[in-house]
Amino acid sequence: MAETLTLRATLKGHTNWVTAIATPLDPSSNTLLSASRDKSVLVWELERSESNYGYARKALRGHSHFVQDVVISSDGQFCLTGSWDGTLRLWDLNTGTTTRRFVGHTKDVLSVAFSVDNRQIVSGSRDKTIKLWNTLGECKYTIGEPEGHTEWVSCVRFSPMTTNPIIVSGGWDKMVKVWNLTNCKLKNNLVGHHGYVNTVTVSPDGSLCASGGKDGIAMLWDLAEGKRLYSLDAGDVIHCLCFSPNRYWLCAATQSSIKIWDLESKSIVDDLRPEFNITSKKAQVPYCVSLAWSADGSTLYSGYTDGQIRVWAVGHSL
């Protein structure tokens, strides 16, 4: 019996692209977060019933431009956002208020991440720098020239490994870079992409990194060795990548569909294309730009350019 994914529900609340989705680490949590070009972050309460999968419980407002990224703290109490207004914000999810503003980037913030212990924050920006912050909103370090990216920094992620703490970044200079967190020095340049890199993601055990972007190729890297292991052809621009938390799967949100690979066999598990009611010939078919798995790996949340979150459930097909 093969595992496949079925469209379970659609969450409607945003009025513009769903740019990022964050799920809590606690599998029993009923919260989901989504960031959007409508300048808000929605806090969803998931009921998972047939009639009502979930509703937007709260809207976090304060950014003056598109919210490009959102991540949730490991205790589920706070979230962090990055916006095209050039700032980061730390939000208290219980009150829905901003507790910190992080000011320092000179252009749009494209990506944010929390360290495993939530004590450090990293951000990537169109100003071509990577900044490291503490939770008080103080910038502790800026990575720029000569080791940094020479174009926009599109994505930054911490490795879950606490023994050898590293940051992975991707940029529009076609580079994936691995940074040593202890001294913010460059550990490896991962070279191979032929177009800008939109997304990088680190596997749950911290051993692998996957990157993707304009060239439509998902590249898998060994983080300890700094070497490319293999490539998977998605056949279209990759907007987002994420590893399953409990299966050896990699998911790619592309311009045409969501592809899911089994990394053991390097074969496609599923290719997800929802049906859209396109009324006019000129209408752009919505596509997926953000992905997140539930903590238990049973549900995949996907954010689309039509402002909707489509919820996919993993099940068996005979």
From Swiss-Prot:
Query: SUPFAM superfamilies, per this entry?
Result: WD40 repeat-like
Task: Cite the CDD domains for this sequence.
Answer: WD40
Which InterPro entries does the UniProt record give?
G-protein_beta_WD-40_rep, RACK1-like, WD40/YVTN_repeat-like_dom_sf, WD40_repeat_CS, WD40_repeat_dom_sf, WD40_rpt
Question: What Gene Ontology cellular-component terms does the record carry?
Answer: ribonucleoprotein complex; ribosome
Pfam families, alphabetized: WD40
User: Which UniProt keywords are given for this protein, alphabetically ordered?
Assistant: Repeat, Ribonucleoprotein, Ribosomal protein, WD repeat
Give me the disulphide-bonded residues. none
**Has the keyword Phosphoprotein been applied to this entry?**
no
- Name where the WD repeats lie: 13-45, 62-92, 104-134, 148-180, 192-222, 233-262, 283-313
Citing just one GO molecular function, the answer is:
translation regulator activity
Protein family according to the UniProt entry: Belongs to the WD repeat G protein beta family. Ribosomal protein RACK1 subfamily.
Q: What is this protein called?
A: Small ribosomal subunit protein RACK1
- Its source organism is Chlamydomonas reinhardtii
